[in-house]
Amino acid sequence: VARGSERSQKCAEHYGVPLYESVSQVPSDIDIACVAIRTGALGGNGTEISIEFLKKGISVILEQPVHHKEIAECFKFARSNNCCFMTGDLYLNMPEIRRMLSVTDYLRNKGVKLEYIRAGSSVQAFYPFVDILNRLVRGGNVNLEYVSPQRGSFKEAIGDISGTPFSFEFNNDMNPHDPDNHMHILHTFTLYYE
């Protein structure tokens, strides 16, 4: 589904797929829709488009970030229309992230203790950052000891997750006219072991 621009027409032609200009044109026998359009959290209509698909009984993967109220609304429509909803998981499938998580699992299984985490991310990619972090430490309670005031584009946080100390650098700045760009940092992780 696209607005029918020259770019979307060329894309559909290149991949040999039909181009629909509204969700209502999409046949009901489609299994899943991947919605890579900004959600309401970023001023877009990706959530509304997702809900239109869900109302048709078509499962949806929606690109992050998504506000928690929008997620709840999408789950409600998925449940009532007997289909599935999830947010995208792009970063967890990147080779570098998979390799890091694999090494972390290997060390954990060998009994090597994770001593400290130094990490950073941006507001645009914070949801997947938290997901990756959760997989590094296998969940747990977060204890924030200190959150700095905003310094330029960044904030810092210090604390621990179930006893594993951390320091996070967070790029807390987004250009409202171009929210997909201008990140100073995407994801960075430095893990210290015994």
Please annotate each region the language model reported.
Residues 1, 39-48, 176-183:
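Short, flexible/disordered intra-domain loops and linkers
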Residues 1-12:
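NAD(P)-binding Rossmann-fold cofactor-contacting core
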Residues 15-77:
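Beta-loop-alpha module in the N-terminal Rossmann-like domain of NAD(P)-dependent dehydrogenases
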Residues 21, 62, 87-89, 146-148:
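Short loop/edge segments at beta-strand edges and connector loops
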Residues 67-132:
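A contiguous active-site-proximal alpha/beta segment in oxidoreductase catalytic domains
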Residues 124-194:
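Contiguous beta-strand/loop segments that form the cofactor/metal-binding neighborhood of enzyme cores
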